[in-house]
Amino acid sequence: MRDKKRLTARSGFLATIVLFIALQTGCASIRGQQYHHFSTPTPIEENQTLILGFLGGRENWNESSRGVRQLAMKIDSMNLPDVHIETLENRKRDLAMELILNSFDSNQDGYLDERERGSARLIMFGHSLGGAAVVKVSNNLNNLNIPVLLTVQIDSVGFTYDDHVIPPNVKRAANLFQLDGWLLVGEDEIFAQDPNKTRIIANVKFDYTEKEIDMSGVPWKRRLLSVPHSKMDADPEVWSTVEKLILSEIGDTKLGILAEERVVDPGPDPRG
């Protein structure tokens, strides 16, 4: 019933959504992102972590004004040992799969064996359509028995896709969202398909009814249809939260994860 209501509510906006996406296309190249744009050498070493960030809308993978790209560049500038980070266009999920498989295929035989799958260290995050792409790629990886350490969805918009259901290959998942937009709002809650295997570490709501966000760097076409959705992409607090989640996962526990009052207690951690 919940999914039916969700689909019915959103289906009426399809024409407007098409316009929204068209407006965001801007000067994006026709071909878009290609594999040679990645800088990560493959395969990566067994103890190394691969982080993938998916941009929203029709933005290019290297659009420096978007929060996903800005955070990726910030983490990359930290020169963290054993960490590789890339950003992707949300529609380039096949490209993401190719990079993931090449990264963890240590013997480069075109197949991830049990040892290679077990040692894979993958983190994914994404905003808007990029948040939904994170779940879609996670499901594809689940079909191959490839684990994901952490997924973070930021105002995830899947339209007809069930991006609120997290597959069991994901160990930990977090969701940041707003409900103030008239057209584009994120998933208000994500759920583990198997709570015994996936821990939902946060469902965090951001309120933009009165919160002031500097939108001077946001093009008018992105503000036209959903100001709160665009505000979330430009909100430093949002990306500080995502950064802490990611750095905590790769071992920088000094930063913590989230303010205690914002964490949803999902029960025992599958890590034991």
Task: State where each predicted segment sits.
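C-terminal catalytic-base region of ester-bond hydrolases, centering on the histidine
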Residues: P168-G272
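Solvent-exposed, acidic/flexible segments
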Residues: N60-V68, E89, R93, G126-V134, ...
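Serine-dependent carboxylesterase/thioesterase catalytic core
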Residues: D82-V83, I100-F191
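Bacterial N-terminal signal peptides
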Residues: A15-Q24
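Active-site catalytic motif of lipid deacylating hydrolases and related acyltransferases
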Residues: T40-A120, L224
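N-terminal secretory signal peptides that target proteins for export/translocation
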Residues: M1-A9
